[in-house]
């Protein structure tokens, strides 16, 4: 790399030749920081052209926040929708987040919940609202922000049907997931983690707290 130019290494070219889009996407992820956002975008574009769904989603984030390229909400949504249609959890979650937030000027709670449900279905299947014990799916802890959103919306006052039991299970997954992120030095999640802790302590969960705390805290 030289200035704003991106020069592919021999290994990069080999990855392209072997259709290893994950290598190219991961190269972009490693460059995703303020001083090299532009380079990250170019690697994401290349991996996306190779069909990497995570890079398509990552380009959505770049356009949403203007990282390495000019912010463009319309393009961000387009990339997120493409990735979500291909089963990307983060893209579906982010669509839910964007539509659920006043910040972007397109708030639509029904649309927000639609995409949160879609994101959850990518992790635990389409039957998760029909009695599935969410606590058993540790895979959810890779997506703490999704779990926080679902826990919040299933709680009293949320925009989904109220399900205290399932809300608490999602929140406990969010708690564990955020703990892992913070332990890995990702301080950006500190505020969300505190929000989860505050909601978990709410009295609406008093009758089920002991049951699930014992389950989730078993391996801590």
Named regions from a protein language model:
Residues 3-4, 10, 14-39, 46:
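Alpha-helical segment of the N-proximal tetratricopeptide repeat
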Residues 22-33, 58-65, 94-101, 147-156:
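Hydrophobic face of amphipathic alpha-helices that form TPR/SEL1-like repeat modules
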Residues 30, 62, 98, 153, ...:
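TPR/TPR-like alpha-solenoid repeats
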Residues 30-35, 49, 67-71, 85, ...:
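Short coil/turn and helix-start
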Residues 178-220:
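Terminal, low-structured helical/coil segments at or just beyond the last alpha-helical repeat
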């Amino acid at each position: 790399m030289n200035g704003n130019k991106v020069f592919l290494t021999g290994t990069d070219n080999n990855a392209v030749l072997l259709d290893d889009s994950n290598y190219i996407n991961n190269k972009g992820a490693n460059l995703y920081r303020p001083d090299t956002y532009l380079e990250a975008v170019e690697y994401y574009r290349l991996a996306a052209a190779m069909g990497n769904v995570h890079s398509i989603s990552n380009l959505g984030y770049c356009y949403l926040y203007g990282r390495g390229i000019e912010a463009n909400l319309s393009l961000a949504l387009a990339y997120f929708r493409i990735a979500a249609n291909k089963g990307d959890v983060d893209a579906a979650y982010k669509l839910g987040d964007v539509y659920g937030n006043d910040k972007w000027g397109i708030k639509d709670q029904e649309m927000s919940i639609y995409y949160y449900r879609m994101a959850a279905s990518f992790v635990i299947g389409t039957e998760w609202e029909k009695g599935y014990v969410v606590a058993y799916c540790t895979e959810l802890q890779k997506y703490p922000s999704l779990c926080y959103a679902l826990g919040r919306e299933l709680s009293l006052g949320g925009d989904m049907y109220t399900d205290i039991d399932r809300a608490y299970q999602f929140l406990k997954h969010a708690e564990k997931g955020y703990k892992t992120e913070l332990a890995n030095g990702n301080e950006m999640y500190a505020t969300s983690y505190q929000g989860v802790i505050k909601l978990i302590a709410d009295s609406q969960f008093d009758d089920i707290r002991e049951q699930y705390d014992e389950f989730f805290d078993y391996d801590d």
